[in-house]
């Protein structure tokens, strides 16, 4: 009886799983590890940072997602930009982003970080942090709720799990 490659893989997987082994691809394991051990660095600029603190507190407990807030960009792989980004603060944001190790992700939180928000037409406001750093996930709201932030983080985890191998992100950097 001849089997196709997929049937052989399925038979091997069933046989090994009955013995307590796991058969998977290395890319899947790497994606799972990266997605479930994010180390965010906060870049709280305004009132959205208060909602971010609420999401990290005991009611929502971001630690259950494997997140550990880090004070240094060199130890972080996720930057959460929360609040109004001014023209004076933009070079500092870019410098902190450049100090992060690859692979790195950015989550833009709130209307001000996404597109300038209420202060969109002010001369001193950057109309979206995506003009300075590449953004992976946008969380809308003014300010967004803690639930919205956690939903955005879950979407980022799904995105990270879809990436394969040791290739770094091919996003355009400015």
UniProtKB/Swiss-Prot annotation:
Coiled coil: none annotated. [4Fe-4S] cluster binds at residues 47-48, 112, 142. It is a peripheral membrane protein. It holds the Pfam family Oxidored_q6. It is found in: Cell inner membrane. GO terms for biological process: aerobic respiration; electron transport coupled proton transport. Its main location: membrane. It catalyses: a quinone + NADH + 5 H(+)(in) = a quinol + NAD(+) + 4 H(+)(out). GO terms for cellular component: plasma membrane; respiratory chain complex I. It comes from the Bacteria. Its cofactor is [4Fe-4S] cluster. The keyword S-adenosyl-L-methionine does not apply. GO terms for molecular function: 4 iron, 4 sulfur cluster binding; iron ion binding; NADH dehydrogenase (ubiquinone) activity; NADH:ubiquinone reductase (non-electrogenic) activity; quinone binding. Keywords: 4Fe-4S, Cell inner membrane, Cell membrane, Iron, Iron-sulfur, Membrane, Metal-binding, NAD, Quinone, Translocase, Transport, Ubiquinone. Binds 1 [4Fe-4S] cluster. Its EC number is 7.1.1.-. NDH-1 is composed of 14 different subunits. Subunits NuoB, C, D, E, F, and G constitute the peripheral sector of the complex. Belongs to the complex I 20 kDa subunit family. NDH-1 shuttles electrons from NADH, via FMN and iron-sulfur (Fe-S) centers, to quinones in the respiratory chain. Couples the redox reaction to proton translocation (for every two electrons transferred, four hydrogen ions are translocated across the cytoplasmic membrane), and thus conserves the redox energy in a proton gradient. This is NADH-quinone oxidoreductase subunit B. It comes from Rickettsia felis (strain ATCC VR-1525 / URRWXCal2).
């Amino acid at each position: 009886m001849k089997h196709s490659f997929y049937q052989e893989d399925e038979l091997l997987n069933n046989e090994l799983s009955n013995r307590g082994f796991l058969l998977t691809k290395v890319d899947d394991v790497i994606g799972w590890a990266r997605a479930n051990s994010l180390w965010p660095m906060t870049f709280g600029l305004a009132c959205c940072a208060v909602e971010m603190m609420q999401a990290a507190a005991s009611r929502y407990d971001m630690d259950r997602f494997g997140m550990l807030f880090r004070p240094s960009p060199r130890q972080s792989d996720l930057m959460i930009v929360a609040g109004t980004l001014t023209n004076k603060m933009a070079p500092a944001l870019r410098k902190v982003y450049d100090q992060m190790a690859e692979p790195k992700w950015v989550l833009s939180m709130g209307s001000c970080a996404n597109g300038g928000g209420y202060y969109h037409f002010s001369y001193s406001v950057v109309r979206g942090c995506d003009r300075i750093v590449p953004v992976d996930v946008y969380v809308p709201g003014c300010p967004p709720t803690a639930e919205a932030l956690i939903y955005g983080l879950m979407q980022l985890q799904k995105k990270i799990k879809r990436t394969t191998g040791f290739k770094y992100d091919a996003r355009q950097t400015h």
